Regions:
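Short loop/turn microsegments at loop-to-beta-strand junctions
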Residues: 75, 99, 179-180
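N-terminal targeting signals for export/organelle localization
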Residues: 1-80
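Short active-site neighborhood of thiol/selenol oxidoreductases, capturing the structured segment around
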Residues: 89-112, 118, 132
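Short, acidic, Ser/Thr-enriched surface-loop or helix-capping motifs
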Residues: 81-83, 185-186
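Structural microenvironment flanking redox-active thiols in thiol-disulfide oxidoreductases
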Residues: 112-152, 162-169
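Residue-level signal for well-ordered, solvent-exposed loop/turn and beta-edge residues enriched
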Residues: 3, 85-87, 190
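Thiol/disulfide oxidoreductase modules built on the thioredoxin-like
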Residues: 147-155, 161-196
Length: 196
């Protein structure tokens, strides 16, 4: 399954197919690696002796929703822009685009590792109808989160959501307690895949 599946059908060039497949494989590898070392707590977290271990729902770290008609939509995702508190970001800002939502926190080690990789994928796909939207959670120090983004030269927008209110929009159908996690929405903003 690749980005080309979510795009409008037009004859792809050989080069664009190579790029898209490489991006999809790279994004999957980055997200899988981050998922293995996720910064989570909650019902899926287990303490094993003196160590902490994450157990993903059903033992899965990559969840795909196919066929497209079986995909659900998240509720309204909106909140203040991390970089500009006077601006509100919304999923509606990305109409008819594939949207990669990344839930992160500057305090999360795997988030620090994956953010530069996500930026590279964003740079490679933003002109192909793919938008990225970050959701910064559990960061009560806004300036620390801003510094995190500036230091890593991240250019895609993020919602600032310390209490995780935005995650309520995902409801009980999708995992929301794993940080970092990435949710890929198709052009109709249906959940196509979740990477924990």
């Amino acid at each position: 399954m690749g980005i080309e599946r979510w795009r409008r059908r037009r004859p792809p060039t050989r080069w664009s197919l190579v790029i898209r497949r490489g991006i999809a494989a790279g994004l999957s590898a980055v997200l899988f690696g981050a998922a293995v070392s996720g910064c989570s707590s909650g019902d899926d977290a287990v303490a094993q002796g003196g160590t902490f271990e994450f157990i993903s729902p059903g033992g899965q770290v990559d969840i795909f929703y196919d066929p497209p008609q079986s995909r659900g939509r998240p509720g309204p995702i909106r909140g203040p822009d991390l970089m500009d508190p006077n601006r509100t970001l919304s999923l509606d800002d990305f109409a008819e685009q594939v949207v990669v939502i990344n839930v992160w926190g500057q305090w999360c080690g795997p988030c620090r590792t994956e953010m530069p990789e996500l930026q590279r994928v964003y740079d490679a796909t933003r002109n192909e109808g793919v938008a990225f939207l970050g959701i910064d959670v559990r960061d009560n120090n806004r300036q620390a989160a801003v510094d995190f983004i500036v230091d890593r030269k991240v250019t895609f927008p993020s919602i600032y959501d310390p209490p995780m209110r935005t995650m309520i929009a995902l409801g009980a159908r999708y995992p929301t307690t794993v940080i970092p996690s990435t949710i890929v929405l198709d052009r109709s903003h249906r959940v196509a895949a979740v990477f924990l």
